[in-house]
């Protein structure tokens, strides 16, 4: 049993990038789909697909197509994804305390009472929340 499914997803993406894989599959959930949608919208992944068929029969699979840049598509669009708020130590910030990831070159993904969004969207709406991860 996985105690932190978001950390598992982040670890799988980081490992797939290091291994230069084209895609990675993770067990699906609503929050993982929302995280994938934000990564796609921000240009860090090419696409994602939810596959309902699974050998176990009860949970679908989320297939994330990773994005590579450069002349020969060798440089990954994601340098690193870092988990911030963990089940044992939650990290909450107000809108004034919200960090700039890599001096504005990365994004922070956080969950607010209005849903999951990036740090720039939360600043525009003047919302704080729990920081899920940093992406750069």
Swiss-Prot record:
GO terms for biological process: translation. InterPro entries: Ribosomal_uS8, Ribosomal_uS8_CS, Ribosomal_uS8_sf. Gene3D superfamilies: 3.30.1370.30, 3.30.1490.10. This is Small ribosomal subunit protein uS8. It comes from the Bacteria. Part of the 30S ribosomal subunit. Contacts proteins S5 and S12. Belongs to the universal ribosomal protein uS8 family. Keywords: Ribonucleoprotein, Ribosomal protein, RNA-binding, rRNA-binding. GO terms for molecular function: rRNA binding; structural constituent of ribosome.
């Amino acid at each position: 049993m996985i105690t932190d499914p978001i950390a598992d997803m982040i670890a799988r993406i980081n490992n797939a990038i290091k291994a230069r894989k084209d895609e990675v599959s993770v067990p699906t959930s609503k929050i993982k789909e929302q995280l994938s949608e934000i990564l796609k919208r921000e240009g860090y992944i090419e696409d994602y697909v939810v596959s309902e068929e699974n050998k176990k029969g009860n949970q679908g699979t989320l297939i994330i197509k990773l994005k590579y840049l450069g002349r020969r598509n060798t440089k990954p669009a994601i340098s690193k994804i870092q988990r911030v708020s963990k089940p044992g130590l939650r990290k909450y910030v107000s809108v004034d305390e919200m960090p700039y990831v890599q001096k504005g070159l990365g994004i922070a993904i956080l969950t607010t009472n209005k849903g999951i969004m990036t740090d720039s969207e939360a600043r525009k709406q003047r919302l704080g929340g729990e920081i899920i991860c940093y992406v750069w």
